Protein backbone atom coordinates (compact mmCIF):
# COMPACT_ATOMS: atom_id res chain seq x y z
CA UNK A 1 0.00 0.00 0.00
CA UNK A 2 1.10 3.53 -0.70
CA UNK A 3 0.57 4.68 2.87
CA UNK A 4 2.30 3.41 6.01
CA UNK A 5 -0.67 4.44 8.15
CA UNK A 6 -2.43 1.49 9.81
CA UNK A 7 -5.62 1.12 11.81
CA UNK A 8 -6.86 -1.58 14.18
CA UNK A 9 -9.01 -4.05 12.18
CA UNK A 10 -12.78 -3.99 12.69
CA UNK A 11 -14.57 -7.12 13.86
CA UNK A 12 -17.28 -8.51 11.56
CA UNK A 13 -20.00 -7.93 14.11
CA UNK A 14 -23.27 -6.05 13.50
CA UNK A 15 -23.16 -4.59 17.01
CA UNK A 16 -19.76 -3.05 16.28
CA UNK A 17 -20.68 -1.82 12.82
CA UNK A 18 -23.99 -0.33 13.97
CA UNK A 19 -22.37 1.62 16.80
CA UNK A 20 -19.86 2.94 14.28
CA UNK A 21 -22.35 4.08 11.64
CA UNK A 22 -24.91 5.45 14.09
CA UNK A 23 -22.20 7.50 15.80
CA UNK A 24 -21.31 8.86 12.36
CA UNK A 25 -24.93 9.89 11.75
CA UNK A 26 -26.70 7.05 9.94
CA UNK A 27 -30.40 6.96 10.80
CA UNK A 28 -31.16 4.58 13.69
CA UNK A 29 -33.89 2.93 11.63
CA UNK A 30 -31.18 1.33 9.47
CA UNK A 31 -28.85 -1.38 10.75
CA UNK A 32 -26.31 -3.97 9.74
CA UNK A 33 -27.57 -7.51 10.39
CA UNK A 34 -26.05 -10.95 10.01
CA UNK A 35 -26.96 -13.01 6.96
CA UNK A 36 -27.03 -16.57 8.27
CA UNK A 37 -27.08 -18.32 4.93
CA UNK A 38 -27.78 -17.98 1.23
CA UNK A 39 -30.80 -20.27 0.95
CA UNK A 40 -34.10 -18.48 0.19
CA UNK A 41 -35.58 -19.19 3.64
CA UNK A 42 -32.53 -17.66 5.35
CA UNK A 43 -32.42 -14.65 3.03
CA UNK A 44 -36.11 -14.13 3.86
CA UNK A 45 -35.06 -13.43 7.47
CA UNK A 46 -33.12 -10.34 6.40
CA UNK A 47 -35.13 -7.12 6.88
CA UNK A 48 -36.02 -5.33 3.64
CA UNK A 49 -35.11 -3.24 1.86
CA UNK A 50 -31.50 -4.39 1.83
CA UNK A 51 -29.35 -1.48 0.69
CA UNK A 52 -25.89 -3.11 0.60
CA UNK A 53 -24.05 -6.28 1.53
CA UNK A 54 -20.70 -6.20 3.33
CA UNK A 55 -18.69 -9.39 2.85
CA UNK A 56 -15.70 -10.58 4.88
CA UNK A 57 -13.58 -13.31 3.32
CA UNK A 58 -10.11 -14.88 3.75
CA UNK A 59 -7.37 -12.69 2.32
CA UNK A 60 -5.53 -15.35 0.34
CA UNK A 61 -3.56 -13.74 -2.49
CA UNK A 62 -3.77 -16.82 -4.71
CA UNK A 63 -7.57 -16.78 -4.69
CA UNK A 64 -8.15 -13.02 -4.33
CA UNK A 65 -6.21 -12.41 -7.54
CA UNK A 66 -8.68 -14.67 -9.37
CA UNK A 67 -11.11 -11.93 -10.42
CA UNK A 68 -14.82 -12.69 -10.29
CA UNK A 69 -16.80 -10.34 -12.51
CA UNK A 70 -15.33 -7.64 -14.75
CA UNK A 71 -13.60 -4.34 -14.03
CA UNK A 72 -15.45 -1.20 -15.11
CA UNK A 73 -13.13 1.78 -15.31
CA UNK A 74 -15.77 3.99 -16.96
CA UNK A 75 -18.32 3.60 -14.16
CA UNK A 76 -21.02 6.28 -13.70
CA UNK A 77 -20.36 9.40 -11.63
CA UNK A 78 -23.23 8.38 -9.36
CA UNK A 79 -21.20 5.40 -8.12
CA UNK A 80 -19.03 6.38 -5.14
CA UNK A 81 -15.72 4.49 -5.20
CA UNK A 82 -12.61 5.10 -3.12
CA UNK A 83 -9.21 3.47 -2.95
CA UNK A 84 -7.83 2.02 0.28
CA UNK A 85 -4.40 3.27 1.35
CA UNK A 86 -4.64 2.68 5.11
CA UNK A 87 -3.63 -0.74 6.36
CA UNK A 88 -6.45 -2.70 8.05
CA UNK A 89 -9.01 -0.04 7.08
CA UNK A 90 -10.97 -2.32 4.73
CA UNK A 91 -13.88 -2.43 7.19
CA UNK A 92 -14.26 1.33 7.12
CA UNK A 93 -13.77 1.47 3.35
CA UNK A 94 -16.52 -1.13 2.90
CA UNK A 95 -18.81 0.84 5.21
CA UNK A 96 -18.09 4.06 3.31
CA UNK A 97 -18.92 2.30 0.05
CA UNK A 98 -22.14 0.86 1.51
CA UNK A 99 -23.35 4.17 2.94
CA UNK A 100 -22.16 6.59 0.28
CA UNK A 101 -23.94 4.64 -2.45
CA UNK A 102 -27.23 4.77 -0.55
CA UNK A 103 -27.37 8.46 0.27
CA UNK A 104 -30.70 8.66 -1.57
CA UNK A 105 -32.14 5.80 0.52
CA UNK A 106 -30.65 6.10 4.01
CA UNK A 107 -31.09 9.35 5.99
CA UNK A 108 -27.99 10.84 7.60
CA UNK A 109 -27.87 13.41 10.40
CA UNK A 110 -26.48 16.59 8.86
CA UNK A 111 -24.94 17.49 12.22
CA UNK A 112 -22.88 14.27 12.37
CA UNK A 113 -19.57 13.67 10.65
CA UNK A 114 -20.38 11.22 7.86
CA UNK A 115 -22.56 13.75 6.04
CA UNK A 116 -19.66 16.22 6.12
CA UNK A 117 -17.19 13.53 5.02
CA UNK A 118 -19.43 12.63 2.09
CA UNK A 119 -19.92 16.22 0.96
CA UNK A 120 -16.17 16.84 1.03
CA UNK A 121 -15.19 13.65 -0.80
CA UNK A 122 -17.89 13.31 -3.47
CA UNK A 123 -16.16 15.81 -5.81
CA UNK A 124 -12.83 13.95 -5.48
CA UNK A 125 -11.42 11.04 -7.46
CA UNK A 126 -10.82 7.65 -5.76
CA UNK A 127 -7.19 8.38 -4.92
CA UNK A 128 -8.03 11.80 -3.48
CA UNK A 129 -10.82 10.27 -1.40
CA UNK A 130 -8.34 7.78 0.06
CA UNK A 131 -5.96 10.62 0.92
CA UNK A 132 -8.80 12.53 2.58
CA UNK A 133 -9.63 9.50 4.73
CA UNK A 134 -5.98 9.27 5.80
CA UNK A 135 -6.18 12.85 7.05
CA UNK A 136 -9.68 12.70 8.57
CA UNK A 137 -9.05 12.46 12.31
CA UNK A 138 -12.73 12.11 13.18
CA UNK A 139 -13.22 9.12 10.89
CA UNK A 140 -10.03 7.58 12.26
CA UNK A 141 -11.15 8.12 15.85
CA UNK A 142 -14.60 6.65 15.16
CA UNK A 143 -12.97 3.60 13.59
CA UNK A 144 -10.56 3.22 16.49
CA UNK A 145 -13.30 3.43 19.12
CA UNK A 146 -15.41 0.74 17.49
CA UNK A 147 -12.44 -1.51 16.73
CA UNK A 148 -12.20 -2.01 20.51
CA UNK A 149 -15.88 -2.93 20.88
CA UNK A 150 -15.91 -6.47 19.51
CA UNK A 151 -16.56 -9.76 21.28
CA UNK A 152 -12.94 -10.80 20.78
CA UNK A 153 -9.75 -9.01 21.76
CA UNK A 154 -8.79 -6.50 19.10
CA UNK A 155 -5.52 -7.23 17.30
CA UNK A 156 -2.84 -4.57 17.13
CA UNK A 157 -2.77 -2.11 14.27
CA UNK A 158 0.51 -3.64 13.13
CA UNK A 159 -0.97 -7.10 12.72
CA UNK A 160 -1.55 -8.28 9.16
CA UNK A 161 -5.00 -9.83 9.39
CA UNK A 162 -5.89 -12.65 7.03
CA UNK A 163 -9.34 -11.43 6.07
CA UNK A 164 -10.74 -8.58 3.98
CA UNK A 165 -14.01 -6.62 3.76
CA UNK A 166 -15.67 -5.57 0.50
CA UNK A 167 -19.08 -4.05 -0.24
CA UNK A 168 -21.67 -5.12 -2.79
CA UNK A 169 -23.96 -2.27 -3.84
CA UNK A 170 -26.66 -1.44 -6.38
CA UNK A 171 -26.21 1.57 -8.66
CA UNK A 172 -28.30 2.39 -11.73
CA UNK A 173 -29.43 -1.20 -12.25
CA UNK A 174 -25.95 -2.71 -11.90
CA UNK A 175 -24.50 -4.78 -9.04
CA UNK A 176 -20.99 -3.63 -8.14
CA UNK A 177 -18.28 -5.10 -5.94
CA UNK A 178 -16.34 -2.22 -4.37
CA UNK A 179 -12.89 -3.06 -3.04
CA UNK A 180 -10.46 -0.21 -2.42
CA UNK A 181 -7.49 -2.43 -3.24
CA UNK A 182 -8.67 -3.25 -6.75
CA UNK A 183 -7.96 -1.12 -9.80
CA UNK A 184 -11.63 -0.27 -10.38
CA UNK A 185 -15.17 -1.28 -9.39
CA UNK A 186 -16.12 -4.83 -10.41
CA UNK A 187 -19.39 -5.45 -12.24
CA UNK A 188 -21.48 -8.50 -11.36
CA UNK A 189 -24.40 -8.06 -13.73
CA UNK A 190 -27.76 -6.39 -13.39
CA UNK A 191 -29.88 -5.97 -10.27
CA UNK A 192 -32.70 -3.89 -8.82
CA UNK A 193 -33.77 -2.58 -5.45
CA UNK A 194 -36.21 -5.49 -5.14
CA UNK A 195 -33.80 -8.27 -6.13
CA UNK A 196 -30.52 -6.87 -4.79
CA UNK A 197 -30.10 -9.25 -1.84
CA UNK A 198 -30.80 -12.36 -3.90
CA UNK A 199 -28.51 -11.14 -6.68
CA UNK A 200 -25.76 -10.32 -4.18
CA UNK A 201 -26.16 -13.78 -2.65
CA UNK A 202 -25.41 -15.31 -6.05
CA UNK A 203 -22.18 -13.30 -6.16
CA UNK A 204 -21.24 -14.53 -2.68
CA UNK A 205 -21.77 -18.10 -3.89
CA UNK A 206 -19.14 -17.44 -6.57
CA UNK A 207 -16.75 -16.20 -3.88
CA UNK A 208 -17.41 -19.38 -1.93
CA UNK A 209 -16.77 -21.54 -4.98
CA UNK A 210 -13.45 -19.75 -5.45
CA UNK A 211 -12.51 -20.09 -1.79
CA UNK A 212 -14.38 -22.78 0.20
CA UNK A 213 -13.04 -21.33 3.48
CA UNK A 214 -15.55 -18.47 3.30
From Swiss-Prot:
Subcellular location: Cytoplasm
This protein's UniProt keywords: Cytoplasm, Hydrolase, Protease, Thiol protease, Ubl conjugation pathway
GO terms under cellular component: cytoplasm
Gene3D superfamilies on file: Peptidase C12, ubiquitin carboxyl-terminal hydrolase
CDD domains, sorted: Peptidase_C12_UCH_L1_L3 (cd09616)
Native source species: Aplysia californica
Pfam families listed in its UniProt record: Peptidase_C12
Catalytic EC class: hydrolase
Protein name: Ubiquitin carboxyl-terminal hydrolase
Matches recorded under SUPFAM superfamilies: Cysteine proteinases
Gene Ontology terms, MF aspect: cysteine-type deubiquitinase activity
Active site annotation, chain numbering: 90 (nucleophile), 164 (proton donor)
Site entry: Important for enzyme activity: 179
Keyword NAD: no
Keyword Cell wall biogenesis/degradation found: no
Family statement: Belongs to the peptidase C12 family.
Amino acid sequence: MASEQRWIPLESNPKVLNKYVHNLGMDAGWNFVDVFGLDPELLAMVPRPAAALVLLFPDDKETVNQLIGEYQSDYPDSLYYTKQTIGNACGTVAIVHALANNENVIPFDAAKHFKTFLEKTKPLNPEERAKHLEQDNLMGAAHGDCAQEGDTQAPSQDEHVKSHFVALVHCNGTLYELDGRKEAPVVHGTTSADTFLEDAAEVVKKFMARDPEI
